[in-house]
């Protein structure tokens, strides 16, 4: 009987080691505002921007397309559809930059990308991936806006 009781206690204590625990800092209001699931995560779209097929190099044309690209980035941030954007250092895969879009479907992402002049002119080519990450990602934008000194 003692050995049966010892085995039962061992099984129960082992099971509790692997069970989920609740977060004492959990803020249900914030989680709901950010669209978080029970794990504090949500679906996003990751876009990798590659060098496009358009090889035009006239400075005025390229500058105009990329000015539109930057204006579109700012517009998407203001409407809370773009959470992360930035260039990548030169690499052998011709990856130029990334976006993390605050949308859940590829169709929504494609609609947003249609508004980017550098993509429309095929100076950049997007690769679209579904991504699952922290729902709190959008919270960094307020801090990010307070730490830059100069614009590009």
Residue ranges of each PLM-predicted region?
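Conserved, structured core segments of small domains
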Residues: 20-152
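Bacterial Sec-dependent N-terminal signal peptides
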Residues: 1-22
């Amino acid at each position: 009987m003692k050995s049966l009781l010892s085995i039962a206690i061992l099984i129960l204590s082992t099971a509790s080691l692997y069970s989920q625990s609740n977060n004492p800092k959990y803020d249900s209001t914030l989680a709901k505002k950010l669209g978080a699931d029970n794990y504090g995560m949500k679906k996003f779209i990751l876009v990798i921007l590659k060098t496009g097929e358009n090889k035009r190099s006239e400075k005025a044309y390229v500058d105009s397309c990329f000015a539109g690209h930057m204006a579109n980035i700012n517009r998407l941030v203001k409407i809370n559809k773009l959470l992360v954007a930035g260039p990548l250092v030169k690499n052998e895969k011709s990856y130029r930059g990334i976006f993390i879009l605050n949308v859940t479907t590829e169709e929504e992402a494609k609609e947003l990308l249609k508004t980017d002049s550098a993509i429309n002119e095929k100076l950049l080519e997007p690769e679209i991936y579904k991504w699952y990450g922290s729902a709190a990602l959008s919270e960094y934008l307020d801090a990010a806006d307070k730490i830059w000194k100069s614009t590009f």
